[in-house]
């Protein structure tokens, strides 16, 4: 077991530490699958939005399959869904790269996974995948957090060599609850307060209350770095570092949001025992044993 380089949830007062790991693991930017300045932007800000990476026809295909799964009683009863805390409507369906042939192919699409492979510097596997819905009028907010804090403490992910990829299936506009991020926050790790409860994921995936930063830390991060919204038309893709501070507002507009979400982790950064006193989260939330490196290649869907 590796040493705990990013402790959290151990003290009664929050604290900060500087990031110990690179953000971009390759320096040969001339060989990057995207423009060098985009890689440099990811290094600086901790996220990147690439508009129109997928075509309108591809998005329509993905949305049709997403809606089919959303209405499938077998999916609803699979134990791999998260529902809105008030309405009971499906918010997320997990493990789509394992349970759905189409979305398994999307996980290995060179347009997205190839970028992740370059940034992380080698072979990848999918730590987590899901499709997300934020309905119009009733979509709830999700509070500020660093994904890595949870993946480290509750899943045992040793280092910051992981990133998320969100494929937008609807237009993300400032008014309909898009992802908000603090540019530059990924270079600072906020140690949170509060012991991890048993089976915490059952509640935290609906509304996280443990493993969230204190308000003073959030205020300081926002003061230093500001807050940006990841907006773009359907077919755009948002890449963001595992430690970038992010969250989203509720959606009280008629404009629903949905996306496909893949977490790419380097194979050398596979999870181990959690850095807390609880058992690991289930595999549909955090892949632990049955993974192999992605066979990243161009994909044809139409």
From Swiss-Prot:
EC number, as in UniProt: 1.14.11.55
Gene: ectD
Catalytic function, reaction form: L-ectoine + 2-oxoglutarate + O2 = 5-hydroxyectoine + succinate + CO2
UniProt cofactor(s): Fe(2+)
Protein source organism: Stutzerimonas stutzeri (strain A1501)
Lineage of producing organism: Bacteria, Pseudomonadati, Pseudomonadota, Gammaproteobacteria, Pseudomonadales
The keyword Lipoprotein is annotated on this UniProt entry: no
Cofactor note: Binds 1 Fe(2+) ion.
A Pfam family the protein falls into: PhyH
Metal-binding as UniProt keyword: yes
Subunit record text: Homodimer.
Marked site positions, Important for ectoine stabilization: 151
Function: Involved in the biosynthesis of 5-hydroxyectoine, called compatible solute, which helps organisms to survive extreme osmotic stress by acting as a highly soluble organic osmolyte. Catalyzes the 2-oxoglutarate-dependent selective hydroxylation of L-ectoine to yield (4S,5S)-5-hydroxyectoine.
Keywords, ordered alphabetically: Dioxygenase, Iron, Metal-binding, Oxidoreductase
Name this protein carries in UniProt: Ectoine dioxygenase
Protein family membership: Belongs to the PhyH family. EctD subfamily.
């Amino acid at each position: 077991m590796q040493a705990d380089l990013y402790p959290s949830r151990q003290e009664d007062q929050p604290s900060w530490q500087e990031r110990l790991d690179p953000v971009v693991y390759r320096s040969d930017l001339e060989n990057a699958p995207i423009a060098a300045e985009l890689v440099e932007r990811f290094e600086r800000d901790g996220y990147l939005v690439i508009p129109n990476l997928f075509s309108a026809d591809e998005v329509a295909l993905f949305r049709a399959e997403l809606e089919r799964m959303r209405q499938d009683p077998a999916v609803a009863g699979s134990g791999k869904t998260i529902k809105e805390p008030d309405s009971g409507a499906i918010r997320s369906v997990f493990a789509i790269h394992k349970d759905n042939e189409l979305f398994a192919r999307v996980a290995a699409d060179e347009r997205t996974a190839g970028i992740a492979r370059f940034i992380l510097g080698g072979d990848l596997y999918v730590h987590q995948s899901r499709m997300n819905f934020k309905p119009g009028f009733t979509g709830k907010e999700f509070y500020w957090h660093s994904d890595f804090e949870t993946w480290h403490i509750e899943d045992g992910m040793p280092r910051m060599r992981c990133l998320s990829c969100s494929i937008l299936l609807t237009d993300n506009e400032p008014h309909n609850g898009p992802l908000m991020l603090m540019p530059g926050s990924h270079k600072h790790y906020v140690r949170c307060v509060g012991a991890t409860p048993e089976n915490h994921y059952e509640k935290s995936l609906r509304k996280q209350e443990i493993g969230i930063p204190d308000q003073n830390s959030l205020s300081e991060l926002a003061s230093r770095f500001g807050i940006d919204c990841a907006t773009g038309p359907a077919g755009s893709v948002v890449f963001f570092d595992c430690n970038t501070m992010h969250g989203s507002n509720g959606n009280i507009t008629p404009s629903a949001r949905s996306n496909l979400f893949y977490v790419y982790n380097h194979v050398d950064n596979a999870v181990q025992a959690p850095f807390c006193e609880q058992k690991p989260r289930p595999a549909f939330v955090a892949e632990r044993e049955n993974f192999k490196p992605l066979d990243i290649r161009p994909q044809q869907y139409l």
